[in-house]
């Protein structure tokens, strides 16, 4: 086929025309990604300019920059651009690039503007923000799709961008995300409800501080929408103030589907206040306008004109494709004269002009609050339809300390007493958020979730900035198509059982017939005084109409004279809601009665319930409630659940009495009892509370019964019976075994008006209550009367007295003729010890700390060791009162039974065996150790030698702990300490899930002795073990008084023992606690809380304080508490609330435990059980295997301690 020259030229022209347009970027690297095509990454402030060149064999080539009308506070970029057109190319220069220049730049031709032949490059300009700062976008939701413009300023992995809708992550949105445009939500992904404003939030997962908020509504509340055109003023984020540069912009935007000349025959005109705008630019070209007004700047790609103040612009040249025209007035150096109304007029040849005014007003002093954007300020919504109220505002000057915002709600309610102001706080139905949207721009939001009709009203946000207050108000009407009638009575004494009200006659009442509705509705109010009559309406003058915010209806005031039935009807959209109520004059009450126990004494108070009493609870309910179930229910605070009791239901007169009998009551029945009146639809409770006192038998207040009273012959004297109990006992007095009737008994005291010689002798009072009897013995010495017999002779049986005297005489004749005075005293101590074995102790005494009931403790002779089985070796240490020597205990039995025949022990004895007081102190320490059961973290008693106490042989034998005291152990290993603590945990947590501590990972690799090493794992173990031991002592109970690392022993296997239970301090004076001069001297004051320092008050909570100090010692490797404070100012230092600083080797969780132990109030300190739980939780989280190893080691130690009795038991005990 032959082709003519003409056809060839035409074909060549077509081919040339169809060649794609190309775009070139000068001086910057162009990257490519399949998701967005070509792109360039720039940095604001670093890369100043960028030039683009568009090539192609087409007419009218040009580069179209991105439209930026949605950018927050930034003008169009025409002011910073240059352009030059040559044949087949178009050169475009963007100067001083900014973050807001981010977008797609198109190379297009007027011939193929919508063709695939055009080319594009996307430019990212990054500064600080990941997302391009855009203004809040209002979107006309048409049911198809919504664009959430989360555009990024740099190329990112789209998986790191998340979208949240009303604070809920929308996972399905990721598939529609393009970082050039944002998220595209289809109708299937998210559907907006009518009248709703939805809060969208874009988050960048690699940086929690990077996010962006959008509020998308059905329409822009500040825009006028007419025939597919938006006409509105753009509100800048900047705050106008004197001397500032400022701009305002009026926009006309076409949003319809017509793509050809959508703005043809449309124009907008700006007018300034005080005739400052110079007019007269009709029919002028844009170029001419620029010439005639120096303030006019025009960029060809944009359809926006910028004019200085004193300028009026009416017309511009628009291309056939432009969909938006704008007018901007720039103010250079604002003055007070610039304030006023600026008018923007939209002129359309076929319609009436549309006018929008902008009120430019600012505080001359500088302090301002500028409202930038608000959500729709009048809303009518359906019940349970969520919505969002928000305000974006700017403050000047920038001072966050002086800016405050407060949400409130105004509504009228006659029921509540008139106009109400409710301060809104965060809750389930209303959530307040505050965010910063710029350097001086803030965003306050109130999310109304599932609003009820009762949430209608005027919502007010009050913003305060220094001396300026500005309010934004919303009128919210929540409506429901369902009628809702209510009948209520405003009376606090009313008893309401379902639809029956019971109250006294002649009561003044106000009864409300209301419909819960925010809009007008029909309400009918009727009554009757006889149940056989028809309901009838009220006369109008009897009712007062109510038209409140969400309550419509009537109020009726009357005096109750007889039973009356009321009916309230609400009719809405052919639906009816009816409520009935009956007012009658019956009443109710609950009460209880006490029947005393048969063991009660006559003097017990009749109004107090004690254990063992019988209690009868009665609930009186009006007979009108006969159709309801009525029963008693008991809430037990210990069990945290309700216990239902059967009840009797006798009916008397017009009342129903529901009775609950509780016999032989205990303290577990203390609590609140509810009388329940219930049917299928309703439940009402009447409550009464009872308190049951725990009973305790009489007990001695001073732990002994050996007081002596001196009296003068002929003078009066009083004897106090130092016995108490619960209930308070009855007191009966005896003299020499016979009732004493001479004196007058007043409470627990015996008053004798005149002492006689026959009063010389032993008195005792018998204190009796329902739980038992205790006797207190008092010796009265009347001056001039003969001495009485020995004290103990009067408190033992007569036969034992006789035997005792005979034994004493024989001992004096044959056993004591050669004894020294000191030996006599020791002999007396031995005999007194034997006597103590015969006492029985009350339960109250047993509840006292063990060191306070030392006189009532006995020595368990199962611990007795034959001295011949004990080998005493070298001295291990000595102190003021005692000496500790190393030794071996040979097994009492000749059989080995699989154990070593010799046991290493520590042997403690006094420094002066002839000193009776010293020996007494050591014997009391022995009794105390007998009273403490074995525990792997408490020093264990093995046995004792007491048979020859009368000649000074008293030895306390304990297990031998071979590692020395903990304080020296820690100090000696400072140089080898391996710190496993790192910033967020411990170094042994290389694999957190395995939780393998260093001490177990390297166990097989350690070439040095484990005892000579020290690491953080050891410190955690030691801290937990001390808490274990102290919790064991606290449960006995035993108060240590002197817990410190120097009084803690450690074994070669790093198991600790708490030692030195503090009896020495009890028997010395206060000098032990006095401050000394040397900082290194281990002063107890540095381990004591303030109450112990000032009042010498020692409790388990003072031990907890000392435990916290021990932890400080442990994690400072034997450091001295309060190292920077000298001794002479230490007490004042503690008084002012100072505590030790966190040690460098200590995890913040462990330091929290220390600070809890150092609370000023003892009640605020934790128990040792709570300390154990905190420590275990910490170790379990970071090193579970370490915790398992500790528990395994302690179990092994416990088994070893249980075997000590094999070295003490006699052969007969072993075999039989």
UniProtKB/Swiss-Prot annotation:
One Pfam family, short name: Ig_3
Coiled-coil stretches noted in the UniProt entry, renumbered to this chain: none
Example GO BP: nematode male tail tip morphogenesis
Binding, ATP: 876-884, 908
Top-level taxonomic group: Eukaryota
Protein species of origin: Caenorhabditis elegans
Positions of disulphide bridges: 619-675, 721-765
Membrane topology: Single-pass type I membrane protein
Ranges of the Extracellular topological domain: 1-789
PANTHER family: PROTEIN VER-1-RELATED, TYROSINE-PROTEIN KINASE RECEPTOR
Class of enzymatic activity (EC top level): transferase
Name by which UniProt lists this protein: Tyrosine-protein kinase receptor ver-4
Signal peptide start and end residues: none
EC number: 2.7.10.1
Physiological role: Receptor tyrosine kinase which may be involved, downstream of pvf-1, in the positioning of ray 1, the most anterior ray sensillum in the male tail.
GO MF, one annotated term: transmembrane receptor protein tyrosine kinase activity
Gene: ver-4
Stretches assigned to the Cytoplasmic side: 811-1216
Sequence intervals crossing the membrane: 790-810
Lineage: Eukaryota, Metazoa, Ecdysozoa, Nematoda, Chromadorea
Cell compartments where the protein resides: Cell membrane
Span of domain Protein kinase: 870-1181
Annotated GO CC locations: plasma membrane; receptor complex
Record-annotated Ig-like C2-type domain positions: 596-691, 697-783
């Amino acid at each position: 086929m032959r082709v003519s020259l003409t056809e060839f030229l035409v074909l060549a022209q077509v081919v040339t025309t169809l060649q794609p347009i190309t775009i070139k970027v000068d001086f910057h690297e162009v990257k490519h990604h399949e998701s967005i095509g070509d792109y360039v990454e720039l940095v604001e402030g670093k890369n100043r300019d960028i030039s683009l060149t568009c090539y192609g064999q087409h007419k009218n080539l040009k580069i179209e920059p991105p439209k930026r009308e949605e950018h927050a506070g930034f003008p169009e970029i025409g002011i910073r651009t240059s352009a030059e057109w040559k044949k087949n190319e178009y050169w475009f220069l963007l100067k001083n690039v900014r973050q807001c220049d981010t977008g797609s730049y198109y190379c297009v031709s007027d011939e193929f503007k919508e063709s695939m032949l055009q080319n594009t490059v996307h430019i990212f300009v990054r500064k600080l923000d990941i997302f391009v700062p855009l203004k809040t976008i209002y979107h006309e939701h048409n049911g198809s799709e919504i664009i959430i413009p989360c555009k990024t300023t740099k190329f990112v992995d789209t998986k790191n961008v998340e979208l949240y809708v009303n604070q809920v992550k929308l996972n399905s949105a990721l598939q529609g995300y393009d970082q050039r445009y944002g998220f595209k939500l289809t109708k299937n992904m998210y559907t907006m409800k009518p009248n709703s404003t939805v809060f969208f939030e874009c988050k960048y997962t690699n940086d929690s501080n990077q996010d962006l908020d959008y509020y998308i509504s059905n329409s822009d509340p500040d825009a006028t929408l007419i025939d597919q055109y938006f006409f509105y003023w753009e509100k800048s984020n900047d705050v106008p103030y004197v001397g500032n540069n400022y701009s305002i912009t009026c926009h006309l935007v076409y949003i319809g589907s017509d793509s050809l000349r959508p703005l043809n025959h449309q124009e907008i005109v700006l007018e300034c206040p005080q005739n400052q705008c110079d007019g007269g630019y009709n029919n002028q070209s844009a170029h001419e306008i620029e010439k005639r007004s120096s303030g006019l700047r025009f960029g060809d790609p944009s359809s926006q004109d910028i004019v200085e103040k004193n300028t009026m612009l009416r017309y511009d040249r628009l291309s056939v494709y432009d969909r938006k025209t704008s007018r901007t007035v720039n103010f250079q150096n604002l003055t007070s004269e610039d304030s006023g109304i600026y008018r923007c007029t939209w002129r359309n040849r076929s319609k009436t002009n549309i006018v929008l005014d902008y009120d430019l007003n600012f505080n001359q002093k500088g302090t301002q609050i500028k409202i930038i954007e608000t959500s729709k300020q009048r809303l009518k919504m359906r019940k349970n339809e969520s919505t969002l109220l928000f305000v974006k505002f700017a403050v000047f000057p920038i001072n966050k300390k002086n800016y405050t915002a407060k949400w409130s709600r105004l509504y009228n309610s006659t029921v509540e007493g008139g106009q109400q102001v409710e301060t809104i706080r965060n809750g389930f139905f209303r959530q307040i958020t505050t965010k910063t949207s710029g350097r001086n721009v803030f965003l306050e939001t109130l999310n109304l979730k599932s609003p009820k009709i009762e949430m209608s009203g005027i919502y007010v946000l009050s913003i305060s900035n220094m001396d300026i207050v500005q309010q934004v108000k919303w009128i919210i009407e929540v409506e429901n198509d369902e009628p809702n009638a209510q009948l209520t009575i405003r009376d606090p004494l009313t008893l309401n059982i379902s639809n029956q009200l019971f109250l006294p006659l002649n009561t003044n009442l106000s009864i409300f017939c209301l419909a819960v509705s925010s809009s007008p509705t029909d309400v009918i109010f009727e009554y009757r005084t006889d149940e056989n009559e028809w309901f009838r309406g009220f006369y109008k003058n009897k009712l007062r109409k109510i038209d409140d915010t969400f309550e419509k209806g009537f109020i009726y005031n009357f005096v109750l004279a007889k039973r009356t039935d009321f009916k309230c009807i609400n009719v809405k959209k052919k639906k009816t809601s009816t409520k009935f109520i009956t007012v009658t004059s019956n009443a109710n009450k609950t009460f209880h009665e006490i029947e005393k126990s048969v063991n009660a004494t006559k003097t017990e108070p009749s109004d107090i319930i004690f254990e063992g009493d019988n209690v009868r609870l009665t609930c009186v309910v009006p007979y009108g409630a006969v159709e309801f179930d009525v029963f008693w229910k008991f809430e037990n605070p210990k069990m945290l659940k309700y216990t239902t009791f059967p009840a009797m239901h006798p009916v008397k007169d017009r009342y129903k009495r529901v009775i609950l009998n509780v016999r032989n009551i205990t303290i577990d029945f203390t609590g609140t009892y509810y009388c329940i009146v219930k049917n299928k639809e309703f439940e009402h409770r009447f409550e009464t509370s009872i308190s049951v006192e725990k009973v305790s038998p009489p007990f001695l207040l001073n732990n002994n019964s050996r007081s002596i009273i001196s009296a003068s012959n002929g003078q009066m004297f009083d004897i106090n019976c130092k016995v108490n109990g619960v209930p308070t006992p009855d007191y009966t007095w005896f003299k020499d075994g016979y009732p004493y009737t001479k004196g007058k008994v007043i409470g627990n005291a015996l008053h004798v008006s005149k002492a006689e010689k026959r009063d010389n002798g032993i008195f005792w009072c018998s204190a009796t209550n329902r739980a038992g009897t205790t006797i207190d013995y008092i010796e009265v010495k009347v001056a001039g009367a003969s001495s009485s017999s020995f004290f103990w002779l009067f408190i033992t049986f007569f036969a034992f007295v006789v035997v005792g005297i005979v034994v004493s005489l024989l001992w004096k004749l044959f056993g004591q003729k050669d004894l020294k005075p000191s030996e006599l005293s020791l002999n007396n101590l031995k005999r007194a010890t034997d006597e103590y074995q015969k006492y029985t102790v009350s339960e109250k005494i047993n509840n006292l700390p063990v060191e306070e009931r030392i006189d009532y403790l006995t020595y368990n002779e199962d611990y007795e060791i034959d001295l011949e089985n004990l080998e005493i070796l070298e001295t291990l240490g000595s102190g003021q009162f005692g000496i500790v020597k190393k030794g071996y205990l040979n097994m009492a039995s000749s059989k080995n039974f699989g154990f070593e025949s010799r046991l290493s022990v520590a042997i403690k004895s006094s420094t002066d065996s002839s000193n009776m007081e010293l020996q007494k102190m050591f014997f009391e320490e022995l009794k105390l150790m007998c009273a403490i059961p074995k525990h792997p973290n408490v020093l264990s008693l093995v046995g004792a030698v007491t048979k020859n106490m009368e000649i000074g042989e008293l030895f306390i034998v304990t297990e031998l702990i071979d590692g020395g005291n903990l304080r020296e152990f820690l100090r000696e290993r400072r140089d080898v300490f391996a710190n496993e603590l790192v910033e967020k945990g411990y170094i042994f947590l290389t694999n957190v899930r395995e939780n393998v501590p260093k001490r177990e990972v390297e166990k097989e690799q350690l070439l040095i002795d484990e005892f000579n090493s020290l690491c953080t794992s050891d410190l955690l173990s030691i801290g937990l073990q001390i808490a274990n031991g102290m919790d064991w002592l606290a449960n006995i109970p035993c108060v240590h008084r002197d817990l410190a690392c120097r009084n803690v022993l450690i074994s070669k296997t790093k198991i600790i023992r708490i030692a030195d239970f503090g009896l020495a301090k009890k028997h010395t004076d206060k000098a032990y606690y006095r401050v000394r001069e040397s900082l290194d001297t281990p002063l107890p004051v540095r381990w004591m809380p303030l109450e112990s320092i000032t009042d010498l008050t020692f409790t388990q909570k003072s031990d907890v304080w000392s435990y916290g100090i021990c932890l400080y010692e442990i994690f400072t490797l034997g450091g001295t508490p309060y190292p920077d404070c000298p001794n002479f100012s230490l007490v004042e230092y503690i008084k002012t609330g100072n505590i030790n600083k966190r040690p460098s080797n200590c995890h913040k969780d462990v330091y929290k435990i220390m600070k809890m132990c150092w609370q000023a109030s003892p009640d605020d300190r934790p128990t040792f059980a709570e300390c154990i739980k905190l420590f275990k939780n910490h170790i379990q989280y970071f090193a579970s295997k370490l915790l398992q190893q500790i528990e395994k080691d302690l179990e092994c130690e416990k088994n070893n301690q249980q075997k000590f009795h094999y070295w003490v038991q006699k052969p007969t005990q072993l075999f039989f």
